[in-house]
Amino acid sequence: DGASVCIQTGTTTELNLAEFFTVNKISYEPVPIETNAEARENYLAGRCDVYTTDGSGLASTRATFDDPDAHVILPEVISKEPLGPVVREGDDNWADIVSWTLKAMQAGEELGITSANAKELGSKLNDNPEINRLLGMDPLQGAEAAGLSKDWALNILAQVGNYKESFDRNLAPLGLSRGMNALARDGGLFYVPPIK
């Protein structure tokens, strides 16, 4: 109760934090800041007890501290706001490619396709037609129209890996758990649509 909190003004985080403290009847002293860099500086200088932003932002900022382990990211989730890829308005083809890239990585995870086995799985027909479609042996409708080769998803999975591999490589080292970013079968929110 009564902690000072560095909070970026004009953001949904500011509103969500105010609601969280009101609902939980906790008093706090907001320390208004304008940028993440300013929040980091004020927090490290001790001008606020707590620093708040999106979980991924907290984790990546904490990783830059001299002693990251001396700082704790609290487990409370104040709000649920989806973060994802963004493309400029009006480039529908690029938006489709970005969207299907994410879906292909999630489908790869769901189907057990990894960077280690993608090329092998893509070299012969499989018993699972969805794997065959995803890896280009039974080309997806619309891939060529979007300017993609029939093995576009195979290339992504072989070079980058599935969603879990990418998450584990890039975000897990920051101390982030999958949480809602897991597949629906694993208790998360990611539902992989049929690959057709």
Predicted regions and their residues:
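Periplasmic-binding protein-like
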Residues: 63-102
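Short, well-ordered beta-strand segments
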Residues: 4-8, 51, 86
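Extracytoplasmic
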Residues: 12, 25, 80-82, 96, ...
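Bilobed "Venus flytrap"/periplasmic-binding protein-like clamshell domains
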Residues: 1-40
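A ligand-binding cleft/hinge motif common to bilobed small-molecule-binding domains
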Residues: 16-23, 37, 44-45, 49-73
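Solvent-exposed loop/turn segments at secondary-structure junctions
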Residues: 10-15, 36-38, 56-60, 79-80, ...
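N-terminal hydrophobic or amphipathic helices and topogenic motifs
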Residues: 99, 103-196
